[in-house]
């Protein structure tokens, strides 16, 4: 990893030894669980705590978080005898999953694909697979049969998920299949949990690990299969520190371990499709949804011909569809990939715009918490009552919509509907994700307004209408993957509709209904869309046909960053079939108080870009206050 991504070896080693206490001796902690006793004094908070804790066990702080009460409430339940403590060995083995606990009933297509994965797992040889199935086709059930085979062979399994929030719903599905939960690995774990997982994985006693991209670097004793779920997701690319792509590192690790690697996706990346065309990956297709469920019908709403009312963002046709859906007692999802209430706040008296002092980015209004926040560095200020430039009061205006604004509009249009917002601001932990799922399943939510977080992995049979508020949002900026990402994102969110026996409908609001990506979504012709995108990449020698590498120079001293970037550019080697562009100010010219300049290396696939850059930069020196970062195969061009 360090060699391919030109990352410091120490940084990669830090990821591998991610639990600082893992090499220490044995430890115990005290965890608490319900006794079944009813406390003499039952308050509303105590009742809520006992109900939400159920049969869970954990530290006082963990149980308080689960129950959404204070630590004092939990301590009171302990004193009242409703909760009891027990010493837990931090290194106690995890219960082993049973591969034959509850085998699923598979369709013919699923059984065929599962059989191939089981055979590949039994041979214990490296082979990469693309499990390409439409949303709702049952990809999870298929790759879990590969996991079951690894368990029968006495080996370990790793399943990577793109979001921490997906972990809790997945754990429930896994428990239903194997009788126990897998070992979870993500940034939300406390140090003691990380230590236990790390040690049990290294000993080979933790059989199945489900986690975020960092789970790739854990010390498995004998991996039998690796699965990358939602493998197209850009969140698998790490943008800070070591700039690695978990999808590609998973394939690399599978090669080292001698085990199959499954990339599961309803909308595979062009790079993955290209590997199938070259014969390097084997494709397994699931062309239809499981059971009686059908793919939803997708229709575009031309916002030029059918615009929303003034001051609103939901077009009349979508309003009518929401009304009809709610009247049938069904659920609605409104999708807008923009957190907060509005992306820009300005003064209508003097024109002042609120910009982050640390980044070249606007401050986003979050009306729920009455704050303006930068989504790049996290800088937060209270929403002011007056303009800081001209002191005018009541002159600040919110420009553009975010999910909070759409939720307000939905509430105004349908006052009897129960509206919920789902973003990383509201679903910040697996426990919060589980709470959201429970509310949806209990019909306690009528309209969900969410960002890309709701496009991944959720299954709600009563959700039959999806409205995409702004399909053009992701097409801005000139990114070479913009159209592909838009197609993937909308297809994924469309896949939330009609997953049960009730048919689903998707309405896509756009100012460009004739755009190739919108036409492909409406027609369902993914193959033609991907063929055109692939040909455009081929003509431009862009990935997967060519290579990119970004060199980002940054410093708190703008002149020092600029001078270093120019020095690097002047020293660029002359290599046939390789071009160096820049330096130029990065689109995000300042980030976290550091001024940024970018160079872009473009080469054919025959060029060993890593060797060229290693020799090039290795011969140079720059001031200590300047950082030079290399991003091989970049996904983010900011």
Language-model segments: residues:
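Accessory, non-ATPase domains that flank or precede helicase/AAA+ motor cores in DNA-metabolism machines
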Residues: 1-265, 272, 277-293, 326-327, ...
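Cys/His-rich Zn2+-binding cysteine-cluster or related metal-binding knuckle/ribbon modules and their
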Residues: 191-192, 203-206, 240, 245, ...
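Conserved strand-helix element at the start of the C-terminal RecA-like helicase core
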Residues: 140, 155-170, 322-348, 396-407, ...
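Conserved two-lobed SF2 helicase motor
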Residues: 199-221, 434-457
């Amino acid at each position: 990893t360090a060699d391919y991504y030109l990352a410091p070896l120490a940084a990669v080693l830090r990821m591998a030894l991610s639990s600082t206490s893992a090499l220490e001796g044995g430890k115990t902690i005290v965890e608490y669980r319900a006794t079944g006793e009813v406390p003499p004094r039952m308050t509303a908070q105590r009742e809520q705590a006992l109900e939400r804790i159920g049969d869970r066990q954990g530290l006082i702080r963990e149980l308080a978080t689960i129950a959404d009460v204070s630590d004092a409430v939990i301590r009171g339940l302990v004193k009242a005898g409703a909760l009891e403590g027990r010493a837990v060995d931090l290194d106690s083995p995890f219960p082993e999953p049973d591969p034959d606990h509850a085998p699923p009933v598979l369709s013919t297509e699923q059984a065929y694909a599962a059989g191939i994965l089981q055979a590949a797992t039994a041979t214990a040889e490296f082979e990469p697979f693309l499990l390409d199935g439409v949303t709702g086709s049952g990809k999870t059930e298929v790759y879990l049969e590969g996991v079951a085979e690894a368990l029968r062979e006495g080996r370990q399994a790793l399943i990577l998920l793109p979001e921490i929030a997906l972990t809790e719903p997945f754990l429930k599905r896994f428990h239903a299949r194997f009788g126990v939960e897998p070992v979870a690995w993500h940034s939300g774990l406390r140090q003691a949990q990380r230590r236990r997982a790390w040690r049990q994985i290294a000993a080979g006693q933790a059989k199945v690990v489900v986690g975020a991209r960092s789970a790739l670097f854990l010390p498995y004793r004998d991996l039998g299969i690796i699965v990358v779920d939602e493998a197209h997701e850009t969140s698998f690319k790490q943008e800070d520190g070591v700039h690695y792509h978990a999808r590609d590192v998973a394939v690399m690790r599978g090669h080292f371990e001698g085990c199959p690697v499954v990339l599961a996706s309803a909308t595979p990346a062009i790079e993955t499709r290209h590997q199938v065309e070259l014969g390097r990956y084997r494709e397994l297709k699931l062309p239809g949804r499981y059971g009686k469920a059908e793919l939803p019908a997708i229709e575009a709403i031309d916002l030029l011909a059918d615009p929303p009312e003034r001051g609103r963002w939901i077009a009349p046709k979508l309003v009518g569809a929401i009304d009809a859906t709610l009247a049938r007692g069904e659920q609605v999802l409104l999708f807008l990939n923009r957190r907060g209430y509005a992306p820009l706040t300005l003064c209508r008296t003097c024109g002042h715009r609120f910009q982050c002092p640390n980044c070249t980015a606007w401050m986003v209004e979050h009306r729920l918490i009455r704050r303006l926040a930068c989504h790049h560095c996290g800088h937060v200020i209270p929403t002011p009552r007056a303009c800081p430039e001209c002191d005018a009061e009541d002159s600040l205006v919110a420009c553009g919509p975010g999910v909070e604004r759409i939720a307000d509009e939905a509430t105004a249009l349908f006052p009897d509907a129960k509206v919920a917002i789902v973003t990383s601001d509201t679903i910040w932990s697996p426990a919060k994700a589980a709470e959201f799922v429970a509310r949806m399943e209990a019909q306690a939510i009528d309209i969900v307004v969410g960002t890309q977080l709701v496009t991944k992995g959720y299954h709600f049979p009563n959700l039959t209408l999806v409205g995409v508020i702004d399909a053009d949002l992701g097409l801005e900026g000139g990114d070479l993957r913009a159209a592909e990402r838009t197609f993937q994102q909308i297809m994924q969110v469309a896949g939330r509709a009609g997953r049960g026996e009730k048919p689903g409908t998707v309405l896509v609001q756009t100012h460009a209904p004739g755009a190739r990506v919108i036409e492909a979504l409406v027609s369902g012709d993914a193959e033609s869309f991907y063929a055109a995108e692939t040909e455009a990449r081929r003509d431009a020698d862009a990935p997967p046909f060519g290579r990119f590498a970004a060199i980002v120079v940054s410093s708190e001293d703008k002149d020092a960053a600029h001078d270093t970037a120019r020095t690097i550019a002047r020293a660029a080697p002359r290599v046939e079939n390789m071009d160096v562009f820049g330096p130029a100010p990065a689109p995000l010219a300042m980030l976290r108080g550091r001024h940024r300049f970018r160079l872009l290396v473009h080469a054919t696939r025959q060029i060993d870009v890593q060797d060229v850059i290693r020799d090039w930069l290795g011969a140079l020196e720059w001031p200590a206050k300047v950082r030079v970062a290399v991003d091989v195969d970049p996904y983010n061009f900011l």
